[in-house]
Design a protein with these regions (language model features):
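Predominantly a Rossmann-like dinucleotide-binding segment in NAD(P)-dependent oxidoreductases
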Residues: 1-122, 221, 256
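A short glycine-threonine-serine/GTX helix/turn-capping micro-motif
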Residues: 37-43, 124, 204-212
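C-terminal helical cap and adjacent loop that interface with cofactors, partners, or active-site loops
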Residues: 131-279
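Contiguous C-terminal substrate-recognition/catalytic subdomains in enzyme active sites
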Residues: 94-95, 99-148, 153-157
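Residue-level detector of functional hotspots within protein domains
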Residues: 17, 27, 33, 47-50, ...
Length: 279
């Protein structure tokens, strides 16, 4: 729909991602909670979202201005412990996680704690948590498109909302990954024309992981002669640019200033996204 010009030229994008109190909290139990290990969720998690944005917009990110804070996890808890198995507050902690109910995790993680000290059921309220749990950014692309992005890590549901604003209309989607409101087997797009009626478009769920993307990715890698009509095959450059948006966001928060992607590495943002299929 976007490439077909249904909403004209894209001028801006609204993109908001929600991690629920299970998936989102899990990053604060594990090594991801330390910015020196994960680079923060700007890099470890949001880079996947920026990769999507770069592909959808078909241009390279040029500059980033960001805000972020730690409002819910870490030091904000009223009680804490080293990990859930040793915690005296399990009866009143809504984030209590009983790893002993998962034998695979007991064998993989708990049995090896004596070697590396890694706690898979770490407390989400540990004082050493130093990553953000609330983030927002304004991203400007080389072709002039502006993006308003946010990531919340303690939402009651999982999924994302996205809207593309164009010169001829608007395309919206609400992808409910934890399906809190219905039992339907499809995602729905809504196409608004500036001077016309709205259209509802149903997209059936994919049968493999990540919305059906896992099967497509494996086919691209392992099956010879697979075509790539939508230019979904990503290069090292694509991966670097996705990470660089997160790094720029982190630097922007630290300095209080917008950060240009070109100032971070030798990669120069292009108005038209480069397509490099290397298999």
């Amino acid at each position: 729909l976007r490439r077909a010009g249904e909403i004209g030229d894209i001028t801006s994008v609204d993109f908001h991602w929600y991690l629920d109190t299970s998936h989102g909290a899990d990053y604060f139990r594990r090594w991801h909670r330390l910015v020196e290990c994960s680079g923060s969720l700007w890099v470890h998690k949001a880079s996947h979202h920026f990769d999507l944005l770069n592909w959808w917009i078909d241009s390279d990110p040029e500059s980033v201005y960001a805000l972020g804070s730690l409002d819910h996890y870490g030091k904000n808890g009223t009680f804490r412990a080293e990990n859930c198995r040793t915690c005296p507050h399990t009866s009143k902690c809504k984030f209590y996680y009983d790893i002993t109910r998962n034998q695979n995790y007991m064998d993989l993680y708990v049995a090896n704690e004596k070697y590396d000290g890694y706690l898979r059921d770490g407390c989400v309220f540990k004082n050493d948590v130093n990553i953000f749990d609330k983030m927002a950014a304004t991203i400007r692309y080389k072709n002039g498109v502006q993006v308003a992005y946010s990531l919340t890590t303690y939402s009651p549901y999982e999924g994302y909302r996205i809207a593309f604003n164009g010169t001829k209309g608007r395309l919206e989607a609400w992808i409910q990954e934890s399906r809190p409101t219905s039992d339907v087997n499809f995602d729905e797009l809504v196409l608004f024309k500036n001077f016309g009626k709205r259209e509802y478009i149903q997209i059936p769920f994919g049968t493999s992981g990540h919305g059906g993307g896992d099967a497509l990715l494996k086919d691209q890698i392992f099956l010879p002669g697979i075509k790539d009509p939508y230019k979904q095959c990503a290069s090292v450059r694509d991966g670097a640019l996705a990470c660089l948006v997160g790094i720029a966001a982190r630097n922007s928060i630290a300095t209080g200033q917008p950060v240009k992607i070109a100032d971070l590495t030798s990669i120069q943002p292009q108005e038209k996204k480069l397509y490099q299929r290397i298999l």
